Amino acid sequence: MQLVLAAKYIGAAISTIGTLGAGIGIAIVFAALINGTSRNPSLRNTLFPFAITGFALSEATGLFCLMVSFTLLYGV
């Protein structure tokens, strides 16, 4: 029984590593937005929706990893 509990905790810890990738992805998206806006300020209205879409996709990846972690801890 203790081995199964340890495996749950290890699996949950490993699955939360994906949230690190989501954080890095969000940082890259907004760094590119700031870089593009500083190079050409007139493109702000064009670049911003793409940045929000990239943010949403990166955040969804992190939320899926967090959901897997909670499922391993409390659902199985």
UniProtKB/Swiss-Prot annotation:
For site (Reversibly protonated during proton transport), what residue positions does UniProt give?
E59
What GO cellular component entries does it have?
Answer: mitochondrial membrane; proton-transporting ATP synthase complex; proton-transporting two-sector ATPase complex, proton-transporting domain
Q: How does it sit in the membrane?
A: Multi-pass membrane protein
Its localization reads: Mitochondrion membrane
Biological process, per Gene Ontology: proton motive force-driven ATP synthesis
Keywords annotated in UniProt: CF(0), Hydrogen ion transport, Ion transport, Lipid-binding, Membrane, Mitochondrion, Transmembrane, Transmembrane helix, Transport
Query: How is the quaternary structure described?
Result: F-type ATPases have 2 components, CF(1) - the catalytic core - and CF(0) - the membrane proton channel. CF(1) has five subunits: alpha(3), beta(3), gamma(1), delta(1), epsilon(1). CF(0) has three main subunits: a, b and c.
Q: Which family does it belong to?
A: Belongs to the ATPase C chain family.
What is the recorded name of this protein? ATP synthase subunit 9, mitochondrial
| Protein source organism | Cyberlindnera mrakii (Yeast)
The beginning of the lineage is:
Eukaryota, Fungi, Dikarya, Ascomycota, Saccharomycotina
